[in-house]
Amino acid sequence: RVSTVVFLHAHPDDESIATGGSIARAVHEGHRVVLVMATDGCHGEKPADLGDETLVARRRRETEASARTLGVTDLRWLGYHDSGMTGWPQNDEPGAFIRADVDEAAERLAAILDEVSADVLICYDWHGGYGHPDHIQVHRVGHRAADLRAERGRGVRLLESTMNRTRIARMMSENPGNEGFDPEQPADDGNPFGSTED
């Protein structure tokens, strides 16, 4: 059975990093895939070759190219700004996703789910993988949108993307040149990184 699968991501590039393989597989298996980006990624790292292009324009262009590469033809934007990392002053900027009212953001997402007749919604785990405030907000908004759909008799199967801490630790130990990152250490917000295989 062909399903409509909606992937909700926090920032441009998260679609490739977190679920690129799942997106490509779903497209390959004939499912309709809709990619929804919560933010514009305005506080990401600025590449040296940016020139006159704004970071938002670059990240949007890169996301459009990524979607095409993955086989996605339906890309949506919820319209929020990147909140920056935990504790950054950008957390308090107007329009920052972390400041968005969860119900209002969930209504925006639910409207997309309704429009595309979504069968499956994929968001992040409770910690957003590594504690980024926008990733945690994706979890909240995704769950609330699924609840809204259920309350209206149009349920959606909700799945969560996470990072496999056990596998990442194994890969790091097998490549001793990878120094400076220990997945067993807490993330910036003090919570564990990803999830274990247990």
What spans do the regions from the language model cover?
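Metal-dependent de-N-acetylase/amidase catalytic core
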Residues: 1-6, 90-91, 95, 99-198
